[in-house]
């Protein structure tokens, strides 16, 4: 991508961002990001998170999903969040800053989970986009594979998984892999997801491995 094209694309994104209904609504409601509405829509349809549950939130910053999850789990629940970027504190959220791809960060996250089993694993992770599909798609698929591996390590039987996936090479095979681990797998495209985005969310329930 040339500098001129990148600048035009960035300018368009900024204009869309500030004109965006969900951005304005997030600001009005005191939510960290418009992404919070994606999880709210998924929750409304699939009822993944309940009071008292333990939730792991991968790719959490700036905290939109963690805010929603903490509210749903309540005082007796627990949200353990991780991101390579910093995140301001949220009541009820135990945040670990670090690169989830690194073993030492994974181990630190597993220590936060402890002996407890996790009820829900959430992943809104995405790589830094270069603009080249040949580069970005493999990076994105690597992250969702790591998120699924996290499920295998911490998820309770009949637990749930919601993960952002970009449609493209590896997408169909990934769905097949997720279906091997969960009883029900649905594809969601929340209204708050930008129409031109290739992102969709896989919502998997009934962990069976």
UniProtKB/Swiss-Prot annotation:
Q: What is its main location?
A: cytoplasm
Which class of enzymes does this protein belong to? transferase
* Keyword S-adenosyl-L-methionine (UniProt): yes
GO CC entries = cytoplasm
Q: Which InterPro entries match?
A: RNA_methyltr_RlmE (IPR050082), RNA_MeTrfase_FtsJ_dom (IPR002877), rRNA-MeTfrase_E (IPR015507), SAM-dependent_MTases_sf (IPR029063)
Q: Which family does it belong to?
A: Belongs to the class I-like SAM-binding methyltransferase superfamily. RNA methyltransferase RlmE family.
Q: Where in the cell is it found?
A: Cytoplasm
Q: Which reaction does it catalyse?
A: uridine(2552) in 23S rRNA + S-adenosyl-L-methionine = 2'-O-methyluridine(2552) in 23S rRNA + S-adenosyl-L-homocysteine + H(+)
Per its record, how is this protein called by name? Answer: Ribosomal RNA large subunit methyltransferase E
- Whichever gene encodes this chain, its name is rlmE
Q: What role is this protein assigned?
A: Specifically methylates the uridine in position 2552 of 23S rRNA at the 2'-O position of the ribose in the fully assembled 50S ribosomal subunit.
Q: Which PANTHER family match?
A: RIBOSOMAL RNA METHYLTRANSFERASE, RRNA METHYLTRANSFERASE 2, MITOCHONDRIAL
The family database entries (NCBIfam families) matched by this protein are listed as: PRK11188.1
Q: Which domain of life is it from?
A: Bacteria
Residues engaged in binding S-adenosyl-L-methionine: 63, 65, 83, 99, 124
Q: Which GO terms describe its molecular function?
A: rRNA (uridine-2'-O-)-methyltransferase activity
Q: Which UniProt keywords are present, listed alphabetically?
A: Cytoplasm, Methyltransferase, rRNA processing, S-adenosyl-L-methionine, Transferase
